[in-house]
Amino acid sequence: MIIASAGHVDHGKTLLVKALTGVDTDALPEEKARGLTIELGFAYHDLGDGSATGFIDVPGHERFIRTMVAGVSGIDVVMFVIAADDGPMPQTAEHLAILELLGVSRGVVALSKIDRVSEARLAEVSATIRTLLAPTALRACSILPVSALQGIGIEALRGELLALQRTLPPRASHGNFRLAVDRSFLLKGAGRVVTGTVFSGQLGVGDAVWHVPEGGELRVRGMHVHNQEATHASAGQRCALNVSGVALRDVEIHRGDWMVAAAAASAARRIDVEVRVLADEPSALANRTPVHVHIGAADVTGRLVTLDGQAIAPGERVLAQLMLDRPLHTLRGDRLVLRDQSARRTVGGGVVIDPAPDMRGRTRDERRAYLAAMALPDAHVSLPTALIALPGGLDLEVFARSWNLNGDERAALLKEPTLKLCASPVLGITVARWQILEDAMLAALSAAHAAHPERLGLGERELEKALRARLLRGVFDAVLDALVSAGRVVRDGAVLRLPQHSARRSPADDALWKRVCPLLERDELKAPVVHDLASALNLNHTLLEAFLIRVAKQGLVVKVSAKRYFLPPAMTRFEQLVRALTVDGNKFTAADFRDRAGVGRNAVIEILEYFDRIGLTHRSGDLRALLDTKRRA
């Protein structure tokens, strides 16, 4: 169990932790000199059941709220300290609001400094506290009078904490390992050590772990759990990891970073959330309000953008997107706290719904439907609804990572009976949607054949456009490949047609094709420009160009520019060359392609610009990258 203190500055939190554990958690000289907690303090103690309980002592001053939030994220129980002489103070209310936003529902109120007040004052403050707690999840917690200086009530407080520990449900061990880093330091003779609270999953010595958002893969050399050397750590424990790896050479590890399993390694600058503005906020939060976002131990600035563009009234709960100034690791269900631009006031909080929103090609209605699916309580309940919400296809890898599903949990998810798998990376649609797309493709080809019997068929881009549906490319490819494999669609070079269809060329075009084709086949990678081809055939340039446009629609040639046409096998070879040049994510220049293809510079530029247009490649400066790993030229 992990217990955190909370409460206003100078109400005796550190002294109570010391009375319970024997440990003075104020370790900094400045803290001792000023009598003020500045940093998180840690202690570990057996409350009486033979197990180590972790205590996190947080600062109470308003200037250190960001540190307080880092300390109470991921805890099991709060020890809420309120001084009997002062009663509830500003940070009492703010700490209580933060605990409510973070979903902390178990705790005890330690009514401290009772040696300074009368019985009447004690009763008055207790009643005030009960009223303060009434609208919160901590409404039923005990209020125990204590004095750390005189030792009054300490054993009763210890007993209450032990009772809470005994009734605490075990932390679920499912999901991937995630540790929110709240400290990072170098230890002589050991190297880099990071500490934090384990939010989910398990980790062992020797395992790989990923530093996000900025780092890479590291190896766990050793660990301590609740201040004791250990070989494994799991959810709900305080953990120190001694890590090593090449990635440490390039980046520092800071508070707010995460140590996670590879399957959970992700970060984004946009996060879809459900947010609630505190009811006592003096005014509504405008759309695009600058905020500080606290998740785990992180504090990141950004803007709060509502889905409907409207302001959020005090007490209102809405869907919104956080547009962050730097990438942040989150997963669905992570709780967050929002503070104002100056970081002086807590204004609200909420929960992450979609940690990796990709709005490309999604309508507003699809987006809302998908968020509604992601807000459901379980991944297996969410998936069928999410598939319906996104008829263009769902990235199942992203979905599983968002829900923090480990390997076994992902495998179980893919057994959903309404799911039809499409591609790798794994995409999915519903079985019913798959059938609709098959029928739509066949109908589009049939309509094209009826409208243009002289054409061989449609190119992939034409077919995709004819469907009038926003589809992930992998979904389109999977459905089409299935139709081709089943013999229901024929792929003729770059053209798609139904098996029973053949182009009806005129006798004149047939005769001309017999003259043109041998010249294009002579050296198929070095097709002549239209002007030279017309001269070689002693044909009118305009008439030949019109002919080539017709046979391009029939799939006999591919038009890469206004003046150059290639046979489909040549374009296939050029595409294979592009893929060879971009193995393992490499990029290439026009000169690289020219040297491998053995064609002239003008032809190279025309070919590569054609590949850019159809979405096979993307140019940035002098370099090109493979953009669509499945698209065919």
Task: Spell out what each predicted region is.
Residues 114, 131-281:
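Conserved catalytic-core segments of large NTP-driven translation/proteostasis enzymes
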Residues 1-58, 62, 207:
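Conserved G1/Walker A P-loop phosphate-binding module
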Residues 52, 77, 203, 208, ...:
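Residue-level marker of beta-strand positions
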Residues 9, 36-38, 44-49, 70-74, ...:
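Conserved catalytic network of the ASCE P-loop NTPase/AAA+ motor domain
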Residues 61-62, 84-89, 104, 113-118, ...:
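Conserved nucleotide-binding/hydrolysis micro-motifs of P-loop NTPases
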Residues 10, 16, 35, 57, ...:
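Residue-level signature of catalytic and energy-coupling elements of molecular machines
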Residues 116-122, 131, 246-559, 568-618, ...:
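C-terminal effector modules of nucleic-acid-centric enzymes and ribosome-associated factors
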Residues 52, 58-63, 72-124, 533:
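Conserved Switch II/interswitch segment of TRAFAC-class P-loop GTPases
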